[in-house]
Regions:
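Glycine- and acidic-residue-biased ligand/ion/polar-headgroup-sensing regions
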Residues: 76-77, 88-106
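Conserved short histidine dyad/triad with adjacent acidic residue
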Residues: 71-87
Length: 183
């Protein structure tokens, strides 16, 4: 038996802590080392389905205050991911399953780069760079890493040129605009 093995379905509170205050279903790993294998990736899908298609993440770090954040994240195509930037944090994405578009914007909202990441692809974003992700497949699962700590509402800066998601028509028009850049 491996001490690094975790399970979301056979939940063990000595290995994982569920964060009920998070915006998405989130778990923090309490053990070191920690191993994420294909069975855990499959459990991400199961947890999402059991929760009406919710996004789910496993944080490989033990707390929002950790100096380095590693997360395995499941996101769904039917949701809006507002462009944002992190003032002093770069980040990297590594696709585990599915496809995901990434958009990089200048300060005025013009698209500087758009690309579709496939399974195994890696993409790094510099600090203070507006960006957005958009799942291309119904579900995308990826590994994201960036510096901590998580600063709550101060962690991300949202631009005025991107809809906040509260107006359905504006949001759908913006999503259609971004979709026109996906090749």
């Amino acid at each position: 038996m491996s001490i690094s093995k975790i399970s979301l379905i056979d939940f063990n509170d000595t290995k994982l802590r569920k964060d009920d205050s998070a915006k998405t279903i989130s778990y923090f790993c309490k053990i070191r080392p920690v191993k994420i294998d294909s069975s855990v990736v499959s459990e991400l899908r199961d947890i999402s389905e059991l929760n009406k298609g919710a996004n789910v993440r496993i944080c490989l770090h033990d707390s929002p205050l950790s100096k380095h954040h590693d997360m395995v994240i499941l996101e769904r195509k039917d949701k809006y991911y507002r462009p944002h930037k992190h003032k002093d944090k770069g980040e990297a994405f590594h696709i585990i399953d599915g496809k995901m578009a990434i958009f990089i914007f200048d300060e005025d909202g013009s698209i500087l780069d758009s690309t579709v990441l496939l399974q195994g692809d890696i993409y790094r974003i510099e600090e203070n760079q507006y960006h957005s992700v958009m799942p291309v497949t119904n579900i995308v699962i990826y590994h994201e890493n960036k510096p901590g700590p998580f600063l709550g509402d101060k962690d991300s800066v949202f631009p005025s040129w991107a809809p906040d998601g509260n107006n359905y028509n504006k949001t759908q028009n913006y999503i259609s605009y971004l979709n026109s850049y996906i090749k």
